[in-house]
Regions:
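A generic alpha-helix surface/boundary motif
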Residues: 126-128, 146, 167, 171, ...
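Short, surface-exposed glycine/acidic/tryptophan-bearing loops
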Residues: 100, 156-177, 233
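Short, small-residue-rich loop/turn micro-motifs
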Residues: 149, 169-173, 221
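A general marker of short, structured functional hotspots
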Residues: 9, 17, 29, 58, ...
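An acidic, Gly/Ser/Thr/Pro-rich helix-cap/linker signature
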Residues: 1-136
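Carboxylate/His-rich catalytic cores and anion/metal-binding grooves
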Residues: 130, 134-168
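Extracytoplasmic and endomembrane cell-envelope/extracellular-matrix remodeling and assembly machinery
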Residues: 80-124, 135-136, 175, 179-183, ...
Length: 283
């Protein structure tokens, strides 16, 4: 059920660059309407500036096509683009589905360059991260999570104030790390990995599964508990598809698929370092 989402994020990480803007459906990530390519972009912000007007034009175009289809117009009346959109959705479709789709056209910028930079940073950090995760008896596969959070950048800072490799916000970090004006251990790759391992293990013990523990790392343990109760299921697929809490938006719904995508791409590197550690222990 999550495979289309995972495949979408693998393409965002490994195929689409900063000059690529993917117009897609917010809920069904199999539906990609178009990829706008800005070849002359020299950096991420420049690419966004160059593509802004074209993206807005295309977004409105697809919204208009979907609305027209929902109102009963035939694909043929809407020309080649209308026919292509109808084929993407496998129409004839229910009007409600098409009206919903008209409000769900989203744009995702490619991340290939950021991913490549993250891979370079990960090479120096991965052996120590794997070792720390093992010390805390948590899955070494969690070593893929910093790629989703920060592309392995210890100096990363989000708009929400999350900091470091593992993107701790101040309130959460204070339970595990030293955070003050003089010293902020969120920037320390090793100390923050120790803290992340403890937090993830705590989430796992409270929620009973690693998929839920990983989502809780983004959405909070209480938020995941609420989602589980509302949906009436422990299955991560059910929660992602069926839960529509006010704070459980696109980013939260896709956090676990993004992790799985990063894990698939990074798995050989993680297993390599895990194997090297096993060899050292056995020697």
């Amino acid at each position: 059920m999550l495979e289309p989402n995972v495949e979408f994020w693998k393409r965002v990480y490994a195929e689409f660059g900063m000059g690529d803007f993917v117009l897609h459906d917010r809920e069904n990530l199999l539906i990609i309407y178009e990829v706008v390519r800005v070849s002359e972009a020299t950096n991420e912000r420049r690419a966004a500036d160059l593509a802004k007007s074209e993206i807005q034009r295309l977004r409105e175009q697809y919204e208009d096509i979907l609305t027209a289809l929902a109102q009963g117009k035939s694909p043929e009346e809407l020309g080649p683009e209308g026919q292509r959109v109808a084929e993407l959705w496998g129409c004839p479709c229910e009007p409600d589905l098409l009206r919903r789709a008209a409000g769900n056209v989203r744009v995702q910028q490619g991340l290939r360059e950021k991913w490549d930079e993250g891979v370079q940073r990960a090479r120096g950090l991965m052996p120590r991260i794997v070792s720390i995760l093992r010390q805390h008896n948590v899955p070494v596969e969690l070593a893929a999570l910093p790629m989703v959070e920060s592309t392995f950048n210890p100096r990363a800072r989000s708009k929400a104030g999350a900091v470091g490799l593992w993107q701790f916000i101040r309130s959460t970090a204070r339970s595990y790390l030293s955070v003050s004006r003089k010293r902020d251990d969120r920037h320390d790759p090793l100390r923050s990995t120790q803290a992340a391992a403890r937090l993830l293990k705590h989430n796992y013990e409270a929620l009973g599964s690693w998929p839920l523990a990983i989502v809780a790392y983004n959405h909070g343990k209480a938020g995941v508990q609420t989602a589980r109760e509302r949906v009436g299921s422990d299955a991560i697929e059910d929660i992602i598809v069926r839960y529509n809490g006010p704070r459980f938006g696109f980013a939260s719904k896709n956090f676990y698929p993004e992790f799985l995508a990063a894990l698939e791409l990074l798995h050989p590197t993680i297993r390599q370092h895990a194997g090297q550690e096993n060899s050292r222990k056995g020697s």
